[in-house]
Each structure stands twice: as C-alpha cells, then as structure tokens.
Regions:
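Active-site helical microenvironments for divalent-metal-assisted chemistry
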Residues: 1-124
C-alpha cells in the first residue's frame, strides 16, 4: 500500500506538505496517474493496485490508517533531518497529520518522538 500510494505521485511528483492546499485536486491528480499506469499491467495486478490506492485514500482500514500515519511521519522526518530554508517553520510539524497517530499506542509513541525532535528545532 505504501508503494501504491507513491505510484500516484509518479507523474505530478510529491507536493511538499507545506504547499498542499487542495486535497481533492491532489487526490484527483494521483488517481489520474494510477489510471495511466494500471492499463500497462495485467488486469488482476491493475485491479489490485487500484483497490489498494482506493483503500489508502479512504483510510477506512487499520492498514490504510497506519500507512497514512507513516507517510506523515516520513514528511516530518524529512523536515527534521533534511536541509530546509532558513525561515522554515518547524512548528508546522507539531500539528501536521497528528490525527493519524491517535488510535494506536505505537503510533502515539512514534509521534511523541517526532514531536520531541521537532521541538528541539523550534527552540533553536
């Protein structure tokens, strides 16, 4: 499911989290990418990829919610450990995707660690 989610970004790229303003447009662009890729595959594989992408987008299963949380965690890690503009607002990380970490003890602990790392950047 993680890889299938990233397939949706194959043509448009991954829009930086701080620049995302229209989730519906982003989802539509990603679905268009899935629709360009899947006809190249055998029918069964194409159907499975489409189903996984839809499951991720709906976030209706525990697996999809985990993948969504991990996708948000990866973004926060990039912000905390990568090169950012001097004026980057690390405070953004403290709320970004927080709702996806609430329903699972392990995800809550991951979020606590990410927030602690972010807080060190905020204090700089």
């Amino acid at each position: 499911m993680c890889l299938v989610h990233d397939l949706g970004e194959a043509y448009e790229g991954d829009i930086p989290a701080v620049e995302q303003s229209d989730p519906a447009a982003k989802a539509a662009a990603e679905l268009a990418a899935i629709d360009r890729i899947t006809p190249l595959l055998p029918d069964e594989a194409a159907a499975r990829i489409r189903a996984l992408w839809e499951e991720y987008e709906a976030c209706a299963t525990p697996e999809a919610r985990w993948v969504k949380a991990l996708d948000k965690a990866e973004t926060i890690l990039q912000h905390n450990q990568g090169a950012n503009p001097a004026d980057f607002d690390y405070g953004f990380n403290l709320t970004y995707g927080a709702e996806w970490f609430r329903d699972d003890a392990l995800l809550r602990e991951l979020r606590r660690l990410l927030d602690a790392e972010t807080a060190r950047h905020v204090r700089r």
